[in-house]
Amino acid sequence: MGLSLAAYAGAALAEIAGCFAVWAWWRLGASALWLVPGALSLGAFAWLLALTPVEVAGRSYAVYGGIYVAASLLWLWAVEGVRPDRWDMGGAALVLAGAAVILWAPRG
């Protein structure tokens, strides 16, 4: 469980940072040099997601989706300085609950 959570959290941070690098270049006028660490970060995202101990890729991606939503709201608050509202938090709780069902459902 610990490795899985660390891999998902690391993947979320890497994907959000990589996408933000492109956003900064495209939308904020940052130097094109931002694309280099952005591409490296997106590569790290794919590698970390592949480390998750889920037996099939699609299920791993579905679980990751819930973690990505929660991590995106943390990024919104910590990096962009916008505090998530109750609707953001409620939506995140719903998707995390769905991710938990997908991850821990008994399969047989």
Curated annotation (Swiss-Prot):
GO terms for cellular component: plasma membrane. The chain crosses the membrane at residues 5-25, 32-52, 62-82, 86-106. Keywords: Cell inner membrane, Cell membrane, Membrane, Transmembrane, Transmembrane helix. It is found in: Cell inner membrane. It holds the Pfam family UPF0060. Coiled coil: none annotated. The lineage of its organism: Bacteria, Pseudomonadati, Pseudomonadota, Alphaproteobacteria, Rhodobacterales. This is UPF0060 membrane protein RSKD131_0092. It is a multi-pass membrane protein.
